[in-house]
Design a protein with these regions (language model features):
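Bacterial N-terminal signal peptides
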Residues: 9-21
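Sec/Tat signal peptide C-region and signal peptidase I cleavage site
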Residues: 20-29
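Beta-strand-rich domain onsets/edges
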Residues: 28-48, 132-194, 198-204, 213-219, ...
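N-terminal, post-signal-peptide region of Sec/Tat-exported proteins
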Residues: 48-87
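Short amphipathic beta-strand segments in non-cytosolic proteins
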Residues: 71-79, 208-226
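Glycine-centered loop-to-beta-strand initiation motif
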Residues: 88-92, 223-243
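Short acidic/polar inter-strand loop motif in beta-rich domains
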Residues: 111-119, 253-259
Length: 308
């Protein structure tokens, strides 16, 4: 088919998608980093460039850039500052100077606070973007019954200069973390790879794990694997194809029990609906009950799977 006809077909498909967008259910955006390389010779003077973004499809940035602060861990475990960092409208990019032989970890760790407080008889939500450092300023004077939960997100990718090493995988004991059984820069299609996930330093059992291959624009549908961690927090993934794979696991979220002796189903803030007047506990005009939030922890990594 001539290039002009292909371009016309693509534009027609995009226009049709835009027309149907209001009635479509949009997939949740994914946070990711994409390295320019995952393996280096190890000359002692090499450069790694990383893109960081939030998008619906991997790895095509289509959401506003986030206020992330990436860092790198060198093979000896020391923290390395990223260089040449720049933020655009849709992505953040930065460089890592690869000097030491071994495996580097590039990470973005973010904390936010969700919750609510009672003020003048009305329960109000904490503003979006609240962090542990700004929580005190986010709660107005006179507020009582403050409910809050710290949500932690960890995004990682890896690169190895020369032979792979494992010092950078020493867990911090905080949040969701990955400790590899199979080294993440030694992956091949058709081969099994095992990773262990820890929650606050302990095996994270029975958590759902998703592995998604990038390049969906050039594939007939999303290539996604859905698995579950075992009692030791381990999961084994057999990669069906080569590519840059995004692996994600999450825990928590929703809301806790409604009160002492009672329970309420987990629900997001969007799902909360006010009760009809007269049916409010405590009489008409009483504040609608909102259960305390539960901390949400998430982990995602981008790994390269080579052809076997």
């Amino acid at each position: 088919m001539p290039v002009k006809m292909i371009r016309t077909s693509i534009l027609s498909a995009l226009a049709m998608g835009a027309a149907l967008a209001p009635i479509a259910v949009e997939a949740a955006p994914r946070s990711w980093m994409l390295p320019s390389e995952t393996m280096f010779v190890g000359s002692g003077d090499e450069w790694l460039t990383v893109d960081a973004a939030l998008s619906t499809d991997l790895y095509y940035f289509d959401h506003a850039v986030q206020n992330w602060e990436p860092f790198a861990l060198a093979p000896d475990g020391s923290k390395v500052a990223v260089e040449n960092s720049a933020k655009g409208r849709l992505r953040q990019t930065f460089d890592v100077h690869v000097v030491q032989p071994g495996t580097y970890k590039i990470a973005i760790v973010s904390e936010s606070v969700s919750g609510s407080y009672l003020l003048n008889g009305e329960r109000k939500m904490l503003p979006r973007g609240t962090t542990p450092a700004t929580l005190a300023q986010a709660v107005p004077a006179g507020a009582t019954d403050v409910w809050s939960a710290v949500n932690t997100s960890r995004i990682e990718t890896f690169a190895t200069a020369g032979e792979p090493t494992t010092a950078v995988f020493k867990p911090t004991g905080k949040g969701l973390e990955m400790v590899p059984v199979t080294h993440p820069t030694e992956l091949a299609s058709g081969e099994a790879a095992t990773f262990q996930f820890l929650l606050d330093g302990k095996p994270a059992a029975d958590l759902s794990v998703s592995a998604v291959n990038g390049g969906v624009r050039y594939r007939d549908g999303i290539q996604q694997l859905d698995l579950t961690t075992d009692a030791e927090g381990k999961v084994t993934i057999t990669w069906p194809d080569a590519g840059m794979w995004w692996v994600n696991v999450a825990s928590g979220g929703g809301r806790s029990a409604a009160g002492p002796g009672g329970s309420a189903p987990q629900a997001s803030a969007k799902a909360e609906q006010p009760l009809a007047a007269g049916n409010l506990p405590g009489g008409e005009g009483a504040p609608r009950p909102i259960a305390p939030p539960r901390p949400r922890l998430s982990y995602s990594m981008t790994v390269e799977v080579l052809p076997s």
